[in-house]
């Protein structure tokens, strides 16, 4: 029997690198706030959506939902001071025995194929992340210089990173470490075992700079 599927959308950034007058998850993209595009992508594929937002963004989000008549069902949870704390808060309302996909709120171009592939493999493996092969040359910085490395041995990691909910919640009970950059690093540090990887869609970029936003507009309207 297929496990229920939850999306945990984390949207705690303030978008300083975007240089905008509001957090990047609320910037308009093809007529809708970025975050609404993200929730729309997940809605057909999950049984429930948990949205983690800073407390001081809740009223503004409610105002946007009214303004744009946004009707995708979701539960809003208060974020923490770090992404780690925000995910941990969100996991408190996700039950055991389900699959949970943790996704960056500012990745509005994740494909249906990527979402489904992460959930499907998580049914078998319990821990999955989408990734993309490296296309640029890589160099390693050291105290005595910098060195070329074999890029074929590296990938970039995307979200949604998808887990058995009870496993991820257990991993998030450990103390925070500075090198916890994503859910995979939290999971691997606690359990000492790797996650399975799938190839994510190339359009699944994280909107960080004005160039990213311009590219996302082109991809959505092309």
From Swiss-Prot:
**Site positions for Positions MEP for the nucleophilic attack, renumbered to this chain?**
151, 206
Q: What is its EC number?
A: 2.7.7.60
- Keywords recorded for this protein, A-Z: Isoprene biosynthesis, Nucleotidyltransferase, Transferase
Pathway per its UniProt entry is: Isoprenoid biosynthesis; isopentenyl diphosphate biosynthesis via DXP pathway; isopentenyl diphosphate from 1-deoxy-D-xylulose 5-phosphate: step 2/6
Query: What's one GO BP annotation on this UniProt entry?
Result: isopentenyl diphosphate biosynthetic process, methylerythritol 4-phosphate pathway
Name of the top EC class for this enzyme: transferase
GO terms assigned for molecular function: 2-C-methyl-D-erythritol 4-phosphate cytidylyltransferase activity
Q: Which InterPro entries has this protein been placed in?
A: IspD (IPR001228), IspD/TarI (IPR034683), IspD/TarI_cytidylyltransf_bact (IPR050088), Nucleotide-diphossugar_trans (IPR029044)
| Gene3D superfamilies reported for this sequence | Spore Coat Polysaccharide Biosynthesis Protein SpsA, Chain A
Q: Which Pfam families match?
A: IspD
Site: Transition state stabilizer. Where? 17, 24
Query: Which transformation does this protein catalyse, written as a reaction?
Result: 2-C-methyl-D-erythritol 4-phosphate + CTP + H(+) = 4-CDP-2-C-methyl-D-erythritol + diphosphate
Q: What does this protein do?
A: Catalyzes the formation of 4-diphosphocytidyl-2-C-methyl-D-erythritol from CTP and 2-C-methyl-D-erythritol 4-phosphate (MEP).
- Give the family from UniProt: Belongs to the IspD/TarI cytidylyltransferase family. IspD subfamily.
Record's protein name: 2-C-methyl-D-erythritol 4-phosphate cytidylyltransferase
Organism field = Porphyromonas gingivalis (strain ATCC 33277 / DSM 20709 / CIP 103683 / JCM 12257 / NCTC 11834 / 2561)
| Taxonomic path | Bacteria, Pseudomonadati, Bacteroidota, Bacteroidia, Bacteroidales
